[in-house]
Regions:
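N-terminal transmembrane alpha-helices
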Residues: 7-44, 58-73, 77, 102-109, ...
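Small-residue-rich hydrophobic transmembrane alpha-helices
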Residues: 50-110, 147-166, 271-335, 369-383, ...
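Hydrophobic transmembrane alpha-helices of multi-pass small-molecule transporters
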Residues: 62-65, 177-181, 206-211, 281-284, ...
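Short runs within selected transmembrane alpha-helices of multi-pass transporters and secretion channels
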Residues: 71, 140-158, 166-174, 195-208, ...
Length: 448
């Protein structure tokens, strides 16, 4: 057995822990990427500039989710072929997806750059921060192909059980991003433009190195393969499109929520933006475990070891419970200090109140996010995308309906009060579908 095959040979809890920890650390440094802009801009430029950067978050997440959803489609198939040791098909799907998504990323980047001002205006971005928000967004879209391709390559690495290489690259690029942020924002005084440019350069370096290392990594699998295969592309898109729709629709929903928050003013937006960054940091633990479960399930399905799938799911739930407890303790103890990292001395009482209330509410219910992510990860690994999509749409509908109906009338708190209910509904729908879809001996024979 190759050492790369530990996801189908080691004990499930051990395998998932070894696999997920570099992904969690990698996701942490991915958020450091994003947080560096916010913290440095907030400390050295001011809360208005922080609000400008934060106002872009919901929109940029839509485009990031297209990349993540596309990676899911390719990653599930790469994992399955890797588990079955069908390296010819594995390399074919890798090549096909990289060519297809490279073209897509360039088109999306051009679209985003050209329509930045229109999109931010439609989101009701406050007039006093609109120009800075548009500037940040346009620089972001110039570098979007790098971000897109890095996310695809990172998924490829994890699909073959290699999560340490993306971690190393993220640490390097995150450190580079922070130093360039400090230089361009604090020393050169380039403000929001400097923060966006620093991130663009760091993403570009990370994407190029990822491609070169992955190309070298693939050389160990000696086999013939096709550069582009339409049938494999169609198979990949059957999985990728529901995932893209799910993730993009959720992010579009968050854009609508952003539009609900914006009329409350710049300071409320600054507090909301600060906690959105914190939510992203804590949620990465649960997202990473869900992302680790998918290739674990897919590899074991491809290797005809379906009895390990349920054990892996239980192991993921255990890890999620531990991380939810940790998140609660940290937030309950340090929520004010965490808010001050973003808001600094310039933050008003309103900004701190919004940030603190939102953060503490999330801390009570992160366990719901954890169990829904683990369940969704199993569904993705099995290629069962319809209930996965439905569950996320219900989650979004609950969050949007409460925010749109109640927040304008009764206050900004209703933007986040419905979040745990959406997570719980998502889990219940996903789990009901999963109970009907556990692989059986017949599944093993069909896969083989």
């Amino acid at each position: 057995m190759s050492k790369d095959e530990y996801l189908i040979t080691d004990k499930p809890l051990k395998a998932l822990t070894i696999f997920a920890m570099p992904m969690i650390l990698g996701s942490f440094f991915q958020q450091v990427y994003n947080m560096a802009d916010s913290i440095i801009v907030g400390q050295f430029v001011g809360s208005s500039a922080l609000a400008a950067v934060g106002a872009c978050a919901a929109l940029t997440n839509v485009f990031i989710c297209v990349a993540l959803g596309a990676g899911v489609g390719a990653g599930v198939l790469v994992s399955r072929y890797f588990g079955a040791r069908n390296y010819s098909k594995m390399k074919t799907i890798v090549s096909t997806s990289l060519i297809s998504f490279c073209i897509l990323s360039i088109l999306l980047g051009a679209f985003g750059f050209g329509f930045s001002r229109l999109m931010m205006s439609l989101l009701q971005t406050p007039a006093d921060i609109l120009d800075e928000a548009v500037l940040y967004l346009q620089v972001y879209f110039v570098g979007f192909p790098f971000l897109f391709m890095y996310n695809i390559l990172s998924t490829m690495f994890t699909s073959i059980g290699e999560s340490k290489i993306p971690l190393g690259l993220l640490i390097f690029s995150s450190v580079l991003n922070i130093f360039m942020d400090l230089w361009m924002v604090a020393d050169l005084g380039l403000g929001v433009f400097g923060a966006a440019l620093a991130t663009l350069i760091a993403q570009g370096v990370s994407a190029v190195f990822s491609f070169l290392i992955f190309l070298y990594r693939m050389r160990r699998y000696k086999c013939r393969y096709r550069w582009f295969d339409r049938q494999e592309l169609q198979l990949m898109l059957r999985i990728a499109i529901p995932s893209v729709l799910q993730q993009s629709t959720v992010s579009i929903g968050m854009m609508i929520v952003q539009a609900v928050v914006n009329p409350f003013g710049t300071q409320a937006l600054a507090g909301y933006a600060a906690t959105m960054r914190v939510e992203n940091v804590f949620s990465l633990m649960f997202v990473s475990i869900g992302n680790a479960v998918s290739p674990y399930v897919s590899q074991n399905l491809g290797a005809n070891k379906t009895s390990r799938i349920k054990k892996g799911y239980r192991a993921a739930l255990l890890l999620d419970t531990c991380f939810a407890a940790l998140a609660f303790i940290v937030i309950e103890t340090l929520h004010t200090q965490i808010s001050s990292l973003f808001l600094g001395k310039d933050g008003t009482a309103l900004a701190y109140q919004v940030s603190g209330d939102y953060m503490r509410w999330l801390g009570y219910f992160f366990i719901f996010m954890g169990i829904k992510m683990a369940t969704a990860g199993v569904l993705r690994g099995l290629g069962i995308m319809r209930p996965f999509l439905i569950a996320n749409m219900v989650n979004l509908a609950i969050r949007l309906s409460v925010a749109l109906i109640f927040a304008p009338r009764f206050g900004i708190a209703f933007v986040w009060l419905a979040v745990p209910a959406g997570w719980l509904a998502n889990f219940l729908i996903s789990y009901a579908a999963l109970r009907k879809s556990w692989p059986t001996d017949e599944t093993e024979r069909a896969v083989s």
